[in-house]
Amino acid sequence: MRDMEEVREVKVLEKPWVEKYRPQKLEEIVGQEHIVKRLKHYVKTGSMPHLLFAGPPGVGKCLTGDAKVIANGELTTIGELVERISNGKLGPTPVRGLTVLGIDEDGKLVELPVEYVYKDKTSELVKIRTRLGRELKVTPYHPLLVNRRNGKIEWVKAEELKPGDRLAIPSFLPAMLNDNPLAEWLGYFFGNGYTDSEERVVFESKSKELRKRFMELTRKLFQDAEIKEDSGKVYVSSSEVKRLVKSLNKDSIPEQAWKGLRSFLRAYFDCNAEIKDKIIVSTAGKEIAEQISYALAGLGIVAEVDDKGSVIISDPENVSRFLDEIGFSVEEKKEEAKALIKKSTLNLGIYVDKELISYVREKLKLSFYENETMWSPEKAREIAWKLMKEIYYRLDELERFKKALSKSVIIDWSEVEKKKEEISEKTGISVNEILEYAKGKRKPSLEEYVKIAKALGVELKETLEAIFTFGKKYLGYVISDEIETLEEVRKEELKRLKELLNDEKLKKGVAYLIFLAQNELLWDEIIEVEKLKGDFVIYDLHVPKYHNFIGGNLPTVLHNTTAALALARELFGENWRHNFLELNASDERGINVIREKVKEFARTKPIGGASFKIIFLDEADALTQDAQQALRRTMEMFSSNVRFILSCVTGDTKVYTPDEREVKIRDFMNYFENGLIKEVSNRIGRDTVIAAVSFNSRIVGHPVYRLTLESGRIIEATGDHMFLTPEGWKQTYDIKEGSEVLVKPTLEGTPYEPDPRVIIDIKEFYNFLEKIEREHNLKPLKEAKTFRELITKDKEKILRRALELRAEIENGLTKREAEILELISADTWIPRAELEKKARISRTRLNQILQRLEKKGYIERRIEGRKQFVRKIRNGKILRNAMDIKRILEEEFGIKISYTTVKKLLSGNVDGMAYRILKEVKEKWLVRYDDEKAGILARVVGFILGDGHLARNGRIWFNSSKEELEMLANDLRKLGLKPSEIIERDSSSEIQGRKVKGRIYMLYVDNAAFHALLRFWKVEVGNKTKKGYTVPEWIKKGNLFVKREFLRGLFGADGTKPCGKRYNFNGIKLEIRAKKESLERTVEFLNDVADLLREFDVDSKITVSPTKEGFIIRLIVTPNDANYLNFLTRVGYAYAKDTYARLVGEYIRIKLAYKNIILPGIAEKAIELATVTNSTYAAKVLGVSRDFVVNRLKGTQIGITRDFMTFEEFMKERVLNGYVIEKVIKKEKLGYLDVYDVTCARDHSFISNGLVSHNCNYSSKIIEPIQSRCAIFRFRPLNDEDIAKRLRYIAENEGLELTEEGLQAILYIAEGDMRRAINILQAAAALDRKITDENVFLVASRARPEDIREMMLLALKGNFLKAREKLREILLKQGLSGEDVLVQMHREVFNLPIDEPMKVYLADKIGEYNFRLVEGANEMIQLEALLAQFTLIGKKK
């Protein structure tokens, strides 16, 4: 068994064989000779027609070299950048560590990595000019992001652009905008400075303020400067200034000025700005004008550049932003500029797609309406946000409707008829009326129908409300309350609702609005498009994922490299992976992956000099109509919702179940695959996992980094993995040492462990219930006078006897038979003649009675000559009907039993308090130790022992704060209990002679079964102070999970919170009062609690203090940081105290890490530095106090320094919406490792090592791609010989024994699919190294074909019962679903020895019953009905 477990573990982590044994060369591709032949021809000729192309082969999407780009934060030209990296060579050149600015799928500005740069030549270009002075020269096929007059936002080829289209430009750019004296001096010099014939620098200005400022800066910056002022001019003589000025070129912003752009711009504008109806700055030429435009964009100021090289700021918003961010030093210019804010001249608005927005409004019945087609950027964001708020509400409402409409409104009238008395009692409808409804004689009203359904346990309220509301609100009609039509209406509405939610145009419209609401773009109108001919050198940058960057003469959103698609390994050699993509288009769950991969793959240039790429669409012949439409749409637009993950965390990273059990993500994979864990914790609380993946990070090209936080938390993740930070989601690449991330304080130390034990011993609990029944005046036999008074165990005895008597009725005696039997002796043989005289009946009549007595086994007869003798074998009783059984039971047990009760007993039914309690306990609380509900039960029990008590009337009371009780009530509901409303009362008490008034809060639960269960767990009824406390045995014997939750409930109720002041905490304890008679038991209880705490490495002590009324026993958690940290992060509190306690724990964690990890490192550096210098210098360099350094030199023990934050400061500055802001203190690159990730259904995040992780690879929501052409290779199924050959090769490599039977079984299931065959082989190998047909069918969840055929033939031959038994055997043996069975029946029906018309008929029937299953019909009933159809058709033939 150990060997088997080891093998399974390896299989979880091993690369799937379907990838491991993928064909590496064209020669290895089998069964596709027609394709291989064509592909080899393409290899030979280098030509590739009839495949997906994003542009004509050999033509890239590129820019001319003078286009500007911000690379690694510096402004340069793309030509200079690419030439420097590529050393002038044509084609692609890989590059690392280069980043540019671009936009994400929401139109937000982000820093993006460049994968490679590209240089090429072309004979055609398109020149584009815009209203704000942008001038771009790009290849005709270069896509640009534009807003067209019809409102669409899309990537359009340059050659297709028209005047009036609006080009996307960023609303701001990050830049170096700090103040800097030298940059300011350069601004003055570039603005109004020059060099005279004596090589002096001259600054000329009418403003006395500017001349004074220029002189101040000159004295400060240049020590040898001689300054003279004369007639509005300042003359500077200095060798330093002379050298500086000679190195400058006034045509561009100098390198020194980029370090303080704000200062440079202010000085430059002070000198050169002219203010009329706009701010106009004359420059030395277009180069510096364009650079100034980029610099202004760093502050979100959009500027125009005219043909003369003037920079123009005209829009009031941009003028206002200029004054706020840069401003003028000259007061006169400042006032003139302020006057411009009232005017509006610049139009950077966006055309909106009114038709698409109207479609969304109509479909989702939105109230908001706006008629204009041109919106300003601010208006677009404002309106889109208003619409999105409504949309979120509507989509949430529709999801609720979908859930409600998925439930049928049809009830089972046969079940109603069986339970008519019970239903009548619950509903108040008479039994006769219910019978008439059940038999169809009368129709109930809708109100009565709902009541009857509710009595059956079917809740129809939500479904009916959904039917009426959805119909009226979204479909525009009012539905009658005729029950006959409701189910049809429900089905139709559910169909319409699903169509609405899957409406691609609606999804596109919602995505469009999201883009409008979130983008950070403006739109510059194109005024001229001109085609150029000649010989041009062109350049481009490849930016993976988002495929765009900010560049151009003025900041513009540009698309990166896209080229044709190409072939395979032989064609591309070592570069084949960059140029080849294989997709499975038929997998419905993979449609979104197809969209994303096609989009990203088609945008990159081929590597290695090839002219095109190729996309393989595997199993294209299996594409459904929906899949074909989805694939077509993917080629046309970017919109999709990708749920696969490419960026992940390492295997040691811990994720958390919703009840905060931690599990290493590598182990989670196994639990998830086996169905043990289906949910994890994330930002929204709990979320369902829909996918989990593992692979080596090298596959996606992202190395793994280790991040260490100031709390000591460590996490390892790929570079593109995203974590939640105070500024939003950030990739690991972008997180630096000193960066801040958000941490969700989580409990730790309690692992998820599969534990199949159940928490209740049902046999012991049933025996305990006798005590409960006796308390309710039920009695055992010999004490009870009637059956009703009996305890349940004795009712069971009578039930068994009643069933025995029912079995004897067939052989029971009539009154006359009993009389004759009484006359016959058991000791001696009596002659028949003598018996005839005693009985006084005729010989014939006596012979008939004797024959019956002999047949029933009461007598035996023998014949001697002509005489016949009779002897009794056993006694008998008159037993022919229920009344006879009633009489016998009353005689044997000595109690009165009603006739109605006897009838119930004879039908096998018995009722009793213990049965009712046991049934409810089994249904609600008989769970495994690893079940989440076990933790809730433990938590509630802990709370009851603290702030609850059991009343004698079966009620359970809880007393606490209102907030605490509201949280507790949620747990009680999860247990299937119905807590009361919270009761609020005034209270008063006296403390040291002083009256104190307040309010108390209570709630209660009335549930006899839960009350009995708590008593079984030794929770006492009444006053616990007098009776004492006990830790339930099931808790003591349980796993860490239930022990932790019990402690949390107990401390949540009765524990005190930690009291913190500045750096330190104390005060965590439990305090319980006891009387003399309960003292020993209470102390034992707290000793047990202390033992439980020790399992979490928490130390505590117990004290006993006498009082006037008795004793106070305290359990005190030992007050030191390490112990408190263990308690708060491993145990903690349930309910209201929980949040505060977690924050205290996180503070202590940071404090201890600072004290034990960070400070020792600083101390070591302090000693080293102070030894070679002095204490004062060391303190200044390290940023600590001098006392700290001196104490380290003295060898004094390290303590918290005064500059460490206090707890009060932590709560104020570090806590954000329940998260803790923590700094990254160390970042290390680990290289390529095996990584893991999970994907959640509702929110793309999960908690990992306390950090909030994102399922990083989400896709674009709105931007549309270039139209593409595609011709698909059609792959046919492989023949069995080809698959068998490959399987034998794999089996040999893996050391497997592949039997012939096992091989044939795999071939049968694979149906020509090589990947399916390999996957089945790998799965079977996890069971046994010998591959047999038995383990193949087991892992594939398939029945043997011969079993399916046998079942169908039995039915066709009229042997329905045996066919039915065979069906049940298949379902139980193989664990198949009904649909699985139908699929195999459909396949095997064509292999039956019957004529073709019958095969056609049966195939049609199988399809009909499959449809019924899809519609939600009962599996077993439908499968048996299908076999019945087989039987009927067989008889007809």
Swiss-Prot record:
Top-level taxon of the source organism: Archaea
GO terms for cellular component: DNA replication factor C complex
Family matches, as Pfam families: AAA, HTH_3, Intein_splicing, LAGLIDADG_3, Rep_fac_C
One Gene Ontology term from the biological process aspect of the record: DNA-templated DNA replication
Keywords for the protein's UniProt record, in alphabetical order: ATP-binding, Autocatalytic cleavage, DNA replication, Nucleotide-binding, Protein splicing, Repeat
Protein modification: This protein undergoes a protein self splicing that involves a post-translational excision of the intervening region (intein) followed by peptide ligation.
Limits of the DOD-type homing endonuclease domain: 185-301, 940-1098
InterPro entries in the cross-refs: ATPase_AAA_core, Cro/C1-type_HTH, DNA_pol3_clamp-load_cplx_C, DNA_Rep/Repair_Clamp_Loader, Hint_dom_C, Hint_dom_N, Hint_dom_sf, Homing_endonucl
Keyword Cell cycle (UniProt): no
UniProt GO MF annotations: ATP binding; ATP hydrolysis activity; DNA binding; DNA clamp loader activity; endonuclease activity
Classification via SMART domains: HintC, HintN, HTH_XRE
Misc remark: The intein interrupts the potential ATP-binding site.
Subunit organization: Heterohexamer composed of four small subunits (RfcS) and two large subunits (RfcL).
Family per record: Belongs to the activator 1 small subunits family. RfcS subfamily.
Protein name in UniProt: Replication factor C small subunit
Source organism per UniProt: Pyrococcus abyssi (strain GE5 / Orsay)
